[in-house]
Design a protein with these regions (language model features):
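Helix-capping/transition residues at the boundaries of transmembrane alpha-helices
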Residues: 10, 86-88, 154, 158-159
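Short loop-to-helix capping motifs
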Residues: 13-15, 91-93, 162-164
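Secretory targeting signals
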Residues: 16-17, 21-67, 97-161, 180, ...
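Transmembrane helix segments
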Residues: 29-40, 164-197
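Helix-loop-helix units of permease transmembrane domains in multi-pass membrane transporters
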Residues: 66-105
Length: 242
């Protein structure tokens, strides 16, 4: 618990993490307002579809939680890196990574729940055709799981690269600008089982894909991707010098 608390404090000290939290909270609600003004019916996924862009904030948090450890500090701090101090304080690299993953998961979970409450309330107030109730709670849990798994996936990639540039660029572009995963579905149906597409089935019911995936199956597939990527990151981290 102490290690998780320490990681939460480190995360809270990062300006980029606060900016990401703001994005995760505000962006989905803003998208919901804009969509409510359109004349197009959004169907069963109204409100929940608006929560998808908020995962950008989760990605940023997952990345900076790891990449900040490798940033070279200022001259007044000796020009060292946080990772050296962290591994000096925590002898076990396994415990260090587990605490960091837990801190990321807790932070992102709280943001997902807060963003879901704000966005779905906004959707209900701005679109009279949409009604959100207790029956949608499993989908809110799905959104939360999707955000957490995406953040952990981003952290795993960053463990390998040690830099936030590559994972941030790829993940954000893939999630918001041009979905490489979706384009790949035009070539092979197996692309539907890539983590971002499979995970969306956790909370969306009208996913435009060539394969029908149940919510639980989508979550398990995405979870497996996270285990594999995080496992590779863990092995690389264990064998590499700080």
């Amino acid at each position: 618990v102490k290690l998780i608390h320490a990681e939460l404090i480190k995360l809270a000290s990062l300006l980029s993490a606060w900016i990401a939290a703001g994005l995760a909270t505000i962006l989905p609600a803003a998208v919901a307002v804009l969509n409510s003004r359109s004349q197009v019916s959004r169907g069963i996924d109204a409100g929940f579809q608006d929560l998808a862009p908020g995962v950008i904030g989760a990605i940023v948090i997952g990345v900076v939680a790891v990449s900040s450890e490798y940033l070279v500090e200022g001259a007044e701090s000796g020009g060292g890196r946080q990772i050296t101090t962290s591994l000096t304080a925590v002898a076990s690299r396994s415990r260090f990574l587990l605490a960091k993953a837990a801190a990321v998961a807790v932070t992102v979970a709280l943001l997902a729940l807060l963003s879901s409450a704000i966005t779905l309330t906004t959707t209900s107030l701005t679109d009279e055709t949409v009604s959100v109730g207790t029956a949608d709670l499993p989908r809110v849990a799905g959104v939360t799981a999707y955000w957490i798994l995406t953040a952990l996936l981003a952290s795993g990639i960053t463990l390998v690269t040690r830099s936030g540039i590559v994972p941030l660029t790829f993940c954000i572009v893939n999630m918001s600008v041009v979905s490489v995963s979706f384009l790949l579905t035009k070539l092979t149906s197996w692309a539907n089982y890539l983590p971002d597409l499979a995970g969306m089935h956790l909370f969306l019911r009208d996913v435009h894909g060539s394969v029908d995936i149940a919510p639980l199956t989508g979550g398990l597939v995405m979870g497996l991707w996270v285990v594999v990527v995080a496992g590779i990151g863990f092995i690389v981290f264990r064998r590499r010098d700080a």
